[in-house]
Amino acid sequence: MSALIKVLVVDDHELVRTGITRMLADIPDIRVVGESASGEEALSLVRQVAPDVVLMDVRMPGMGGLEATRKLLRQNSALRIVAVTICDEDPFPARLLQAGAAGYLTKGACLEEMVRAIRQAADGQRYLSPEVAQRLALRAFDGDVAQSPFDQLSEREMQVTLMIVHGERIQDISDKLCLSPKTVNTYRYRIFEKLGVEGDVQLALLAVKHGLSGVNAG
C-alpha cells in the first residue's frame, strides 16, 4: 500500500475548499488533514497538521499565494506546495515556480489531474497542468518573460493592476484585499510609475498588449 499523503487545502472560498476535500475523500492514499482560508492562517496550521502537500490558492485577500509559498518554504523547505489558480492565463506561474512551488494547477482540473499533481509533488517531482506548461514554454520561446513590464510588479501590485483593468473601483479593491482606500491608491500610483503609464486607460491598453486583459483578478 502506498504511503498516506497528508494534504492541506488553502483557499479563501469555503465552497472551493469543501469541494476539493470531498473530491479527495475517496482517494485511499490521500487525506485532507486541514483547511485554511488565508495564507496567514496556513502558516500557523502547517505547524499543527504537518501536511506533506499544500494546495495553495494563488490569489487571496491579505497574504497571497506567492508570499505564503515563500514563507512556508522558509519555515519548512521539505514542504511540497501545488499552486492552484482559476485561470490558465495567470501571470504568476513562473514566479511561483521560482519561489519553490512543486506544481501549478488550474481550478478546472479534473480529479485525476489533481491526484496526479499531489502524488508527483509528494514524490519529489514537479507537476504543471498542460495549459500552464504550454504557456510557459511559448513565453520562454518568444522571449516574452524578459520583455513583459508587468514582471517588475510585486504580487500585490499585480492583484491591484488586474482589478483596475477589470474596471473595479478603489473602494471595491479596498474591500476585497482588506486594504484602506489610501493604500490602494498608493499601490495604484506606484504601478503607474513602474509601468510608465499616466492613468487607468493607458494601464488597460498595456495589459491588453501583454495578454493580461483576460486574466481573472481574484
What function would you assign to each model-found segment?
Residues A3-V16, I20-L24, L153:
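Conserved acidic segment of CheY-like receiver
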Residues S38-E41, P61-E67, D88:
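Acidic catalytic/metal-coordinating carboxylates
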Residues S44, L66-A78:
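Short amphipathic alpha-helix used as the core "switch/output" element in two-component signaling
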Residues V49-L55:
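Active-site beta3 strand of CheY-like receiver
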Residues D57, T85:
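Active-site residues of response regulator receiver
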Residues P91-Q98, G103-Q159, V201-Q202, K209-G214:
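Short, flexible helix-to-coil linker/hinge segments that flank and couple to helix-turn-helix
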Residues A146-K182:
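Helix-turn-helix DNA-binding segment
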Residues R169-Q202:
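Recognition helix of helix-turn-helix DNA-binding domains
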